[in-house]
Amino acid sequence: FSRVAGKAEWNNKAESGSVTLDGPAFYYSLEASKEELGILAGALANAEGQRLALLPSGEAFVEILDDVQLESNGIQRRVRHYEITGLGFLPVSVWLDESGSFFGFVDSWLSVIPEGWEGAVETLLEVQQTRSVAREQQWATELADLPANGFAITGVRLFDADSAVTRDGMTVLVVGDTIQAVGTDGSINLQD
């Protein structure tokens, strides 16, 4: 990656391109390390509106969340939780220390954290999980737009557990949070 006189160029094993920039932007490489997330979080935290254009395309936003006090072998460190939106379908968590440097990335299947601080992974995961549950509950409330009269799903392939068969061409009528009727397509009155 290079940026010279307002022109950014990139080239890696999967992509190459260039663009003329008229403002701040961050190149987030396809092969980004977890430490690069920390650099991005810091750049976003210092950007106007905590947003930056991403190269080769897109935009990222950061939300600065919880501070957590950690201790390992008598040493204490305060770390801060950052959530970056715009890299995928869900926000990505990263932890920075008090100086704004990368401290860690923790996940249930992969964690990158300084040697000696491995014991903090569970604490940080718990904070992230609490945030994730709260976010999903908020989304469920904000995004749930159930029609007052219900809705029908037609052309359903339904598994009938009583007879252990699948049935094609079925309609499922949902009113509120309850399945009101199930029948073959065209057999349920959808007008009421």
Predicted regions and their residues:
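Aromatic-rich beta-strand edge motifs centered on tyrosine
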Residues: F1-R3, S93-E98, I113-G119, V172-V174
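Gly/Pro-enriched, hydrophobic low-complexity segments
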Residues: R80-V112, G186
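Short, small/polar residue-rich loop motifs at catalytic or cofactor-binding pockets
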Residues: G88-L90, D145-P147, V165-D168
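Histidine-rich, glycine-flanked metal-binding segment
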Residues: S163-D192
